[in-house]
Amino acid sequence: MDIVSHQKIRRFEAGTFQEIESSVATEYPLTIYVNDQELVTIVCTPEYLEDLVVGFLTSEGIVRGPQDIDSVDIIEATGHAKVSANFVNKFNAKYRGKRYITSCCGKSRENFYFQSDASLVNVKQNGSLQLTTDMIFRLMENFEQNSATFHQTGGVHNAALCSSAEIIYSRMDIGRHNALDKIYGRALQDGTSTEDKAIIFSGRISSEILVKTAKLGCGIILSRSAPTELAINMAEELNITTVGFIRGDRLNVYSGFERIT
């Protein structure tokens, strides 16, 4: 399925209109069923859908990890993801029903945030990873080079999992949380440890993005944008290093200063 469509538009520039073709991000609703029961519909970018499903179910505590999932069947034509699970968390299973998560998330996702997060995040973030400023600038440069769809459409969020030396996984999605869930799902299925890794994110570091980072077990998050006040406060409580405004040869460290040299 195409992740970008091409639309004829009228652009106003230099005092005149002209008809051009513009690249637009595809928006795709995916309904997840767990053991034949409808759980949620997520509006997403239609790629790496199995990664999204595994990452979402694990990060939201519906399952404990890939070991609880027997199979994931993605039916692209109907927008269905059918999951067969051998274990479902009974507490979080109460969220079953017709939940609809838009690409911008917000209140439509509130049932999946803060109510059960305390038991899902690692409040003892002690990742061994440390980064120098030169490492950060190099990683961000590589991240930007892998952001073709973002630059093409301006309508997606990018996220990456990286070590001090390289980007391991890079995923994009119209939903900022989805991009992180796709990374988490891939890492879980590959057996890749996230505790000694960092997250690179294309957008603002909100409290919800900070919680997602904590659920992944990463001790550092890097972004070209800034964190919110609540995100900084949560980062200090969870011992997560937040680095923002990474542009050119400058950056700001907002929390967890000891990991950046």
Swiss-Prot record:
Keywords, comma-separated and alphabetical: Cytoplasm, Molybdenum cofactor biosynthesis
Segments passing through the bilayer: none
Primary location: cytoplasm
GO-annotated molecular function: sulfur carrier activity; sulfurtransferase activity
Subcellular location: Cytoplasm
Protein family: Belongs to the FdhD family.
Name this polypeptide is given: Sulfur carrier protein FdhD
Species of provenance: Listeria monocytogenes serotype 4b (strain F2365)
